């Protein structure tokens, strides 16, 4: 994945997370929860829902994973160790015959364009499309549950 393939809406803030300013943005201001999360959901989260997302990240020290994770997304071949792992997984996913359910989001956010096209090349895959941006469980929970139920029913069972 290259920065020029990254969502225009998310590019600036994620570049900020990966810069020296990232610690202020995440650890002090909790921007992953306060900005990225609600900005990646089509509907508005209510106060009760937002408070539940905030709950694990009340203290600055508890926010470290929300800083480390954006810094580990493999972009422009960095960080190299993560790029290598993701590439090996991609190679494996492209070739294996394990049944897969691809829950596509429309309009989508990160998994769009060439990345989405690549996922569609995987063997033995069923695709469903639900309404959503990135955190699709918040926009289409029932549709996702129904898709999983239907897909599981299609998988042969060994007794």
Question: Can you annotate each of these PLM segments?
Answer:
Residues 1-33:
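Flexible "cap/lid" loop of the alpha/beta hydrolase fold
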Residues 4, 109-110, 135-139:
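A short, basic/aromatic alpha-helical/loop segment that forms part
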Residues 44, 61-121, 127:
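Conserved serine/cysteine hydrolase catalytic core
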């Amino acid at each position: 994945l290259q920065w020029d393939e990254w969502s225009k809406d998310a590019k600036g803030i994620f570049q900020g997370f990966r810069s020296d300013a990232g610690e202020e943005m995440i650890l002090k201001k909790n921007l992953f929860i306060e900005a990225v999360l609600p900005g990646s959901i089509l509907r508005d989260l209510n106060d009760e829902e937002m408070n539940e997302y905030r709950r694990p990240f009340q203290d600055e020290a508890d926010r470290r994973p929300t800083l480390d994770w954006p810094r580990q997304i493999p972009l422009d071949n960095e960080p190299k160790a993560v790029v290598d792992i993701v590439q090996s997984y991609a190679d494996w996913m492209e070739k294996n015959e394990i049944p897969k359910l691809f829950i596509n989001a429309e309009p989508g956010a990160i998994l769009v364009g060439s990345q989405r096209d690549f996922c569609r090349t995987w063997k033995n895959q069923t695709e469903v499309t639900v309404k959503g941006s990135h955190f699709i469980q918040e926009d289409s929970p029932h549709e996702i549950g129904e898709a999983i139920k239907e897909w599981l029913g299609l998988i042969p069972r060994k007794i």
